[in-house]
């Protein structure tokens, strides 16, 4: 090879060119719309293959054998990373906690549901320092059970067993978390260019709420800075940060305190020496480290010499035993500010009693003082937190129950409804944050009933647009990130969804009134006790509308429909919890509530990813929904057809027509455009960025060309129906996987 080539001498070229591929398109055009998040975790990167069903594999797992192996591992200290106090329990708790703790309610992303802690950036976050060793300790267990036990489930299960092994109460465990095999591209972690401790500043300025959907207060943290906001040892300001960030993770004050107190009953922090002696994180470490990071040159670099957060010491004198000592140490002592050996700011009890000293983590005959972080002291200083802490201290049973429930919620919040939980230790109790729906308690409508109902819906006075728009509004709340939302439950008829601006409350109320009458008539007249839920009827209305629209366009097609949805009650619906599902933008309905700092087409990509759609599926749905007339407020933007209500490919044909010239309506705003005839200069169409992106972006234009072709009519209708069915069934976890994902047989 020529020595002048950058391939033979990388030093001759800048880092951006040190690749066989050279610069990427994104390097040249940083603002280029990326569709990558729609195609992540595809079959080509997944070694398990398309046919692998993790839920079915998990059902064959010897669950209690895994638990026995984990119990044995807790006290099987390894010389390459010895266990503090001879017990790995606290270490695995931190690993599980930090796996689940990235969840945020704003977009449902983060959390433990995919085993994402194995990949960048999480595997190299400062707050996850040394958790690479925890996962390596678990490898023999993962290796033994293979495909039957995902990393995602194993990490949470290890945390659960760790608590059990040290006497803590647990509420249960549900498996079913399938692993990913590449880093997530869809999660927005922030724009900062430095980690916490490396220059990143707090996101909370003057007590004001920080950017949605973020939950952690600094880049690289799971929750808050334990030393206080920006490292300032101010417990009162820390209380504000804690309350804000835990609320964004779906926790109230009681859950926050129970969870923290229970977790900090165990283990210790590590700051034995100069943090400058810590090596690179896993993603930046040398290849010989084999994926391990944070190698320390401080004495042995492990055991009593470990450096992780920089804080040093246990919270309690009994760091591997469930008891009430955390509250005793928190509430019964005065504290003074000190520095750890690594220089971190922490608090030490004043004149601790001998019995309140802790054993050394690797030298049990040595007695060491306990400590509290600034974040811990927030629970003693903040009046509301202190009231809860005192109540827990005086009522150990209340604390135990609150902790067990909060830990279960933390670890399962992103798994969706309880029907997705697997294993013999799933709690029987329904919990409001699981968005429960009642079971089916009646015979379901059969084929003849469904055909009759479709006819009645089409004869009800509701238009195709009414039927399709309502079905879309019901189903499109689904988020694949945490498996919330969707059509099952018919919560579109309940607060808060019935009042959302995007759902056009007056129109929605009119449509629901008609559907409720159709339901009542069917329930009263159907034989054999058969009933139809409103949830099913809403979706069936969409099916009927699409079939009519296709027929009117010359295409006979049956839209798949699977009855079995039920209707949730107001008592099963936490209104505040559902408010985060309200779409502020829905490109499928050409709706934008407020202007965002990012282009509206990026919001369409984001929503499509949450719905589990590919770029072709997104494309065909937008084109079909435009001509069916489901735009918010009856807007004509993007309705590129002279036969609205028919399922045609007119959107694509007219978008790609070179006889039309486009320009912004207002030079000061780039979200509304007018299309005029190049020859006559007459206005033909209006459009938003969400419409025009299908002609301007090269990838989306290539897809649009497929559907705009003269021979594409039938393909367009079939692809639209398949993508539509996928959205309608997104939350039907009771259906076979292939049917739920609307895969062709």
UniProtKB/Swiss-Prot annotation:
Q: Which organism is it from?
A: Phenylobacterium zucineum (strain HLK1)
Q: Which GO terms describe its molecular function?
A: catalase activity; heme binding; metal ion binding
This chain is encoded by the gene named katG
Q: Where is this site: Transition state stabilizer?
A: 94
Q: What is this protein called?
A: Catalase-peroxidase
Q: Where is the signal peptide?
A: none
Q: Which SUPFAM superfamilies match?
A: Heme-dependent peroxidases (SSF48113)
Q: How is the cofactor bound?
A: Binds 1 heme b (iron(II)-protoporphyrin IX) group per dimer.
InterPro entries for the chain: Catalase_peroxidase, Haem_peroxidase, Haem_peroxidase_sf, Peroxidases_AS
Tell me which family the UniProt entry assigns to this protein: Belongs to the peroxidase family. Peroxidase/catalase subfamily.
Which Enzyme Commission number(s) are on file for it? 1.11.1.21
Please name the CDD domains in this protein's record: catalase_peroxidase_1, catalase_peroxidase_2
């Amino acid at each position: 090879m020529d020595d002048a080539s950058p391939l033979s001498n990388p030093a001759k070229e800048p880092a951006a060119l040190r690749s066989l591929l050279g610069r990427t398109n994104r390097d040249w055009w940083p603002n280029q719309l990326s569709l990558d998040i729609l195609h992540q975790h595809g079959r080509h990167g997944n070694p398990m293959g398309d046919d692998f069903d993790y839920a079915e594999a998990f059902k064959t797992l010897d669950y209690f054998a895994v638990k026995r192996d984990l119990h044995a591992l807790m006290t099987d200290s390894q010389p390459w990373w010895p266990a503090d106090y001879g017990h790995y329990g606290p270490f695995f708790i931190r690993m599980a906690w930090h796996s689940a703790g990235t969840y945020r309610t704003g977009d449902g992303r983060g959390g433990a549901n995919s085993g994402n802690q194995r990949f960048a950036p999480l595997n190299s976050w400062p707050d996850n320092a040394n958790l690479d060793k925890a996962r390596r300790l678990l490898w023999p267990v993962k290796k033994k059970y293979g495909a039957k036990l995902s990393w995602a489930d194993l990490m949470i299960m290890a945390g659960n067993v760790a608590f059990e092994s040290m006497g803590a109460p647990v509420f249960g465990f549900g498996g079913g978390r399938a692993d990913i095999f590449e880093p997530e591209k869809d999660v927005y972690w922030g724009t900062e260019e430095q980690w916490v401790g490396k220059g990143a500043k707090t996101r909370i300025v003057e007590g004001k709420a920080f950017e949605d959907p973020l939950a952690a207060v600094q880049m690289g943290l799971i929750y808050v800075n334990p030393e206080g906001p920006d490292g300032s040892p101010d417990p009162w300001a820390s209380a504000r940060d804690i309350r804000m960030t835990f609320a964004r993770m779906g926790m109230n004050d009681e859950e926050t305190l129970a969870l923290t107190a229970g977790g900090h009953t165990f283990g210790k922090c590590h700051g034995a020496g100069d943090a400058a002696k810590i090596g690179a994180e896993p993603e930046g470490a040398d290849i010989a480290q084999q994926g391990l990071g944070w190698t320390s040159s401080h004495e042995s670099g492990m055991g009593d010499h470990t450096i992780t957060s920089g804080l040093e010491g246990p919270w309690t004198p009994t760091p591997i035993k469930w008891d009430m000592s955390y509250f005793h140490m928190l509430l019964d002592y005065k504290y003074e500010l000190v520095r750890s050996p690594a220089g971190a700011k922490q608090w030490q009890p004043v004149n601790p009693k001998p019995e309140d000293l802790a054993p050394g983590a690797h030298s049990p005959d040595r007695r060491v003082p306990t400590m509290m972080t600034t974040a811990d002291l927030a629970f003693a200083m903040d009046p509301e937190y202190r009231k809860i802490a005192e109540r827990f201290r005086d009522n150990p049973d209340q604390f135990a129950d609150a902790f067990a429930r909060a830990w279960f919620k933390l670890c399962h919040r992103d798994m969706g409804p309880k029907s997705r939980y697997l294993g013999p230790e799933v709690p029987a109790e329904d919990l409001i944050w699981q968005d429960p729906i009642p079971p089916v308690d009646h015979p379901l409508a059969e084929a003849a009933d469904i055909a009759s109902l479709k006819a009645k819906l089409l004869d009800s006075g509701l238009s195709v647009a009414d039927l399709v728009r309502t079905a879309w509004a019901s189903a499109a709340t689904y988020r694949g990130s945490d498996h919330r939302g969707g059509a099952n439950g018919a919560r579109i008829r309940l607060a808060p969804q019935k009042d959302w601006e995007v759902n056009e409350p007056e129109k929605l109320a009119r449509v629901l009134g008609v559907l409720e009458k159709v339901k009542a008539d069917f329930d009263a007249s159907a034989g054999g006790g058969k009933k139809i839920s409103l949830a099913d009827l809403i979706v069936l209305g969409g099916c009927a509308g699409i079939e009519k629209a296709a027929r009117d366009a010359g295409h006979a097609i049956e839209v798949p429909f699977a009855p079995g949805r039920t209707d949730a009650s107001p008592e099963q619906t936490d209104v505040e919890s559902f408010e985060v599902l309200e779409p502020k933008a829905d490109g499928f309905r050409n709706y934008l509530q407020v202007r965002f700092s990012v282009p509206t087409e990026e919001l369409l990509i984001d929503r499509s990813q949450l719905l589990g759609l590919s770029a072709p599926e997104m494309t065909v749905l937008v084109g079909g929904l435009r001509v069916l007339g489901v735009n918010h407020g009856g807007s004509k933007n993007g309705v590129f057809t002279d036969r609205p209500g028919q399922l045609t490919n007119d959107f694509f044909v007219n978008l790609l027509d070179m006889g039309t010239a486009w320009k912004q309506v207002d030079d000061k705003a780039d979200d509304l455009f007018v299309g005029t005839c190049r020859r006559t200069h007459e206005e033909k169409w209006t459009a938003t960025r969400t419409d025009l992106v299908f002609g301007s972006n090269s990838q989306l234009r290539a897809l649009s060309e497929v559907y705009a072709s003269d021979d594409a009519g039938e393909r367009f209708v079939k692809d639209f129906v398949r993508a539509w069915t996928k959205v309608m069934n997104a939350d039907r976890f009771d259906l076979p996987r292939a049917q739920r994902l609307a895969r062709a047989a």
